[in-house]
Amino acid sequence: LSLRGEQRTVCESLIEVETFKLKIYGESQITFNNVNIKEFDVDVYGESQLTMQKGIIDYQSITAFGEGKINAVEVKNRKGKYRAIGEAIFRVNTSEHIKFTAFGEAELYYKGNPEIDKGFGVGASTINQIN
């Protein structure tokens, strides 16, 4: 799925799939009310916002280019890989493992007790637990 521009999109029904790829461009606001996804791959370009209200994701890989805001703190996630080029903000709920790589002033806020692997990065990125 690819979304562009400055639109607001709400997926009201349950998204239940093995693999879901999402690309967001511009200043879009995307909300998923409920998800059940095995592998979720997201690329965010610009100042877009992605919000997930509830659900389960086994593995998620999210890359933000710019000032993207990702709010997935209400979604139970086992493993996650988060990359930022810019000033992105990630809010996630991950139980086992997080890999976080940032170039810029990105922020990662996480719920759970995962192992944290901070990849190579440049800039003043921060990682904070929010339990």
Segments predicted by a language model, with ranges:
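Glycine-rich hexapeptide-repeat left-handed beta-helix
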Residues: G104, K118-G123
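Short "repeat-start/strand-capping" segments in structured domains, especially the N-termini
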Residues: L1, S13-L22, F32-V42, M52-I62, ...
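Solenoidal tandem-repeat scaffolds enriched in leucines and small polar residues
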Residues: L50-T51, A64-I70, A84-G86
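Residues at the loop-to-beta-strand transition
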Residues: Q7, S28, S48, G68, ...
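Extracellular beta-strand-rich, repetitive "passenger/adhesive" scaffolds
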Residues: L3-E6, Y25
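Short acidic/polar N-terminal linker immediately downstream of export determinants
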Residues: T9-C11, S125-N131
